[in-house]
């Protein structure tokens, strides 16, 4: 008798995706981030669902409802801080996952890569709208500043912004619709994840060497299931340490002040995971130019596959490209730091240099390095 997991219409899909899936024998811990992102998404959906049971999306009561969750709901404080810091964990895993894709040339799987970029945009949109919901000072002013960027679009900009706001300023209508979108988007993300995996399983996983691994596959279960579970335990441990010892470490104290349209906070800034893009936005003195640079800072990922000049897929054996990659990482960390600083000398200049370097490395220096490496290897 054939095993039920190989014949049952539903279990068959699970079997081919998680159990009998042929996987490369040499994938490292950098390949754990996909499953970790799945874990983060599940944590966010579950904690978010329980928060939504007690939250009210009304300007008069939103702030109080969050306070009520933390003070009066059983383990409400735990659910709230798991959700807030779960978002940070999500983005750490996301950036590591994308970085892995760039380093090992996983972007050559075009469909998988492009769905991944759409996923990144969707997660960023969800996180932004979620940050508005507690209706603190930074929620309100963050929403005002970021939605206002759309007014830089020629001709239709102002109309578009007022349409998104549902009025002439960020108000009750805005909060209600942001809550609706924040609730629905994670389920759309979950559906996109399925498509992401569908495309990935068409080709199979890449591996650190970048060489086809068809001749050396091992079953996903038990080898990589146990490896994923170890990753889960480590991430849950780190998340719980953050939640239970310093839950407000990554938050902004201004968000503990209820939203007040008449009082602007001294430094309006987004959560840490958007600071690099915020720094790029601020480094350009022109509004439309800044918005375009902001969008391009993420959309540039879609261009990367077409700039791949190397005869090798992975950076594993390409020292010049490796150096540039780690300079890019350092540059992104610099931009993150600058995004959280006030707009004054020397931060403005550092931000501008770092922004130019970011685009230069990806668009010019990395393709050049690849060509030089090909030349050295006489290819």
From Swiss-Prot:
Binds 2 heme b groups non-covalently. One of its GO terms (biological process) is mitochondrial electron transport, ubiquinol to cytochrome c. Its cofactor is heme b. It is found in: Mitochondrion inner membrane. InterPro entries: Cyt_b/b6_C, Cyt_b/b6_C_sf, Cyt_b/b6_N, Cytb/b6-like_sf, Cytochrome_b, Cytochrome_b_C_euk/bac, Cytochrome_b_N_euk/bac, Di-haem_cyt_TM. It comes from the Eukaryota. Heme b b566 binds at residues 97, 196. GO terms for molecular function: metal ion binding; ubiquinol-cytochrome-c reductase activity. It is a multi-pass membrane protein. The keyword Membrane applies. GO terms for cellular component: mitochondrial inner membrane; respiratory chain complex III. Keywords: Electron transport, Heme, Iron, Membrane, Metal-binding, Mitochondrion, Mitochondrion inner membrane, Respiratory chain, Transmembrane, Transmembrane helix, Transport, Ubiquinone. Pfam families: Cytochrom_B_C, Cytochrome_B. The keyword Membrane applies. The chain crosses the membrane at residues 33-53, 77-98, 113-133, 178-198, 226-246, 288-308, 320-340, 347-367. A ubiquinone binds at residue 201. The cytochrome bc1 complex contains 11 subunits: 3 respiratory subunits (MT-CYB, CYC1 and UQCRFS1), 2 core proteins (UQCRC1 and UQCRC2) and 6 low-molecular weight proteins (UQCRH/QCR6, UQCRB/QCR7, UQCRQ/QCR8, UQCR10/QCR9, UQCR11/QCR10 and a cleavage product of UQCRFS1). This cytochrome bc1 complex then forms a dimer. Component of the ubiquinol-cytochrome c reductase complex (complex III or cytochrome b-c1 complex) that is part of the mitochondrial respiratory chain. The b-c1 complex mediates electron transfer from ubiquinol to cytochrome c. Contributes to the generation of a proton gradient across the mitochondrial membrane that is then used for ATP synthesis. Heme 1 (or BL or b562) is low-potential and absorbs at about 562 nm, and heme 2 (or BH or b566) is high-potential and absorbs at about 566 nm. This is Cytochrome b. It comes from Lepus yarkandensis (Yarkand hare). The lineage of its organism: Eukaryota, Metazoa, Chordata, Craniata, Vertebrata. The gene is MT-CYB.
